Amino acid sequence: AYIVGSIPTSYLVGRIASGVDIRERGTGNIGSSNLTAQVGAKWAAPVVIFDIGVKGLLPVVIASDRVLGLGIGVEAAAGIAGVIGHNWSIFSKFHGGRGMATMLGATLGLNLPLLIIYGSVPAIGVLFTPWKDSAVWFLIAVILMPIWAALLNLPIELVWFSVAFALVTAAKRMTSNSLRDNAGVI
């Protein structure tokens, strides 16, 4: 799951589609947000679909009862491994995106009610409040996930999955901010 999550799809699509190295433009982040800003949404859409379906959902499904039957704990670990791979890619000197789309895919495979909460907080926030920055709303959703998982009485593995994702998100935010140089390149 980590290796699949590590595939730097936004970087590759930026290079192939328009010859742009997104590590050297915009935020310097090699995620779909920077790809959208630098190359355009028509190129970012397939990347988001890949990140959701292949990096997030596929490892969870493979670990699930539908394929290998390894149990909810291994499914959750596979989802987190995909996100960690996306955030700290072995193919990109351990730089990566923020993992939000990969997390959507992992959560889709793990638990639909948790996915609805994770996805609806940013949607409601952006659509119905004056604060239009989806990153803020995704961060709020990440913080709320463990609380909702516990309130919904989900299996303890999903509560820990939510806690792990919150910690991975916090770690990515802190390391991204500390690694930026003055040129805006990570």
Where are the predicted features?
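C-terminal ends of transmembrane helices
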Residues: 10-13, 83-95, 122-131, 170-180
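Cytosolic, membrane-interface loops and tails of multi-pass inner-membrane proteins
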Residues: 12-44, 96, 178-186
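Short, non-helical or kinked segments that cap or interrupt transmembrane helices
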Residues: 20-31, 91-104, 131-141
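Interfacial segments of multi-pass membrane proteins
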Residues: 36-40, 63, 100-130, 143-152
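Multi-pass membrane catalytic core of lipid/isoprenoid biosynthesis enzymes
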Residues: 37-64
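Helix-coil boundary and interhelical linker segments in multi-pass alpha-helical membrane proteins
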Residues: 56-77, 108-114, 149-160
